[in-house]
Amino acid sequence: MIAGIGVDIVELKRMKEVIEKNEKFIDRVLTPEERNLFDQLGEKRQVEFLGGRFACKEAFSKAYGTGIGKVKLTDVEVLREENGRPIVTKSPFEGKVHVSISHTEIMAIAQIILEDD
């Protein structure tokens, strides 16, 4: 049974500006495992990656019904399977978490569906 649905969209230009102004923002968004993946990417892909992960975590907070204030961004971890598919590996939700991320040149969007067992 679906317990929640959340969607978020991020402007990548804005994400790049935030990174340039305050690099500590990266560690407020990413878990250590996510940061490891981030550090292996080129600058353009880093912005897309961070934007996508930020959108995932915002979408999760909407689906979970709390907003980011009650759930820290690092409470949710989105890694990838061998084929590159994103997968939520850590969250406060006890059921199944489905995630989809997409990018264009200017935007990143993510959708989260929470499913009770």
PLM regions: where:
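Core catalytic alpha/beta fold that binds nucleotide/phospho-ligands
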Residues: 1-117
